[in-house]
Every structure is written in C-alpha cells, then in structure tokens.
A protein has these predicted regions:
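Polar low-complexity intrinsically disordered regions enriched in Ser/Thr and small residues
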Residues: 55, 59, 68, 142-144
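Short acidic-glycine-tyrosine-enriched beta hairpin
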Residues: 128-145
C-alpha cells in the first residue's frame, strides 16, 4: 500500500466518527480536544501528508503559482461517507506574492463552497504558521468552516 492509500485508509475510521456531526465552533473545539496535535490520528495524518508533499501527490496543482497549491486526494465515495479529501499548500512567507484588493497581508485561498461544511486539518510546515478558523487562528490542529 502506498502512502496516499495509507492516508485514505487511516482517515476512514475518523470520517465514520464525524459523519453525522455539524461543522461549527463546537465541533472545532471537540476536534482539537480529541484529535489535536498530540493525538495518534493527527500525528499519523500529518506525517502522511508531509510525505505526500515530498512524493508529489499532495497539493501538487498550482492555483496561484507555487505558493498556493492543492489537489484532490480522494473524491467523495460511499466508503468515505461522501467526504472528499483535499490537500492544500499555502506559503505566505512573502505576502507580497499574493494580490488582494484590500491590500491585506493575509493569504486567502480561492473562494469555494462546501454546502455541508468543511473540516481543515492544519499541518504547519514552518513554526508559527496558522490558519484562521471559527475560534481564531489555529496552528497544528483543526478548523471548521
């Protein structure tokens, strides 16, 4: 089994557990408490996604140049309870590399929608990197949208 398949298989029990939950602030707190950066699940998935970046199967499609990439690791399937798995890479070390109408120095992903919500596992590659979630800025851990 390759690392991509290992990531998918490791995700399925987690997806089974969260399939009937509603993304929001309560779920974000729950995820960070139960599956935060010191949990086995977080450690396994973050290790596999980092390997995916190295092997070139995770976040390998440029959206706005090499500093903003993503890839669909898995389309929704019955096996994953109709969740998809997507990897996103954002390098905001040089905010001038990203144009914003409001001249804000915060990197934003392209607009996209999720009718049933979104769970984001935040895997910083650099110390101090964060993603804004419902509870504010989040380093290693989870956000919901």
């Amino acid at each position: 089994m390759g690392h991509r398949e290992e990531l998918i298989e490791r995700s399925i029990p987690f997806l089974r557990e969260v399939k009937d939950m509603t993304p929001g602030a309560d779920m974000e707190r729950w995820l960070n408490k139960k599956y935060g950066e010191n949990s086995d699940l977080y450690k396994d998935l973050s290790r596999l996604i980092k390997i995916g970046l190295e092997e070139g199967w995770a976040a390998n499609i440029e959206i706005s140049g090499p500093n903003y990439r993503r890839s669909k690791i898995l389309e929704p399937t019955p096996e994953t309870f109709h969740f998809s798995i997507t990897a996103v890479y954002m390098n905001s070390k040089d905010p001038r590399a990203f144009e914003h109408d409001d001249n804000d120095d915060v990197l934003r992903g392209d607009y996209h929608g999720h009718p049933y919500g979104e769970l984001n596992m935040v895997v910083p590659l650099d110390k101090g990197a964060q993603l804004k979630g419902l509870q504010g800025w989040q380093g290693p851990g989870w956000t919901c949208a």
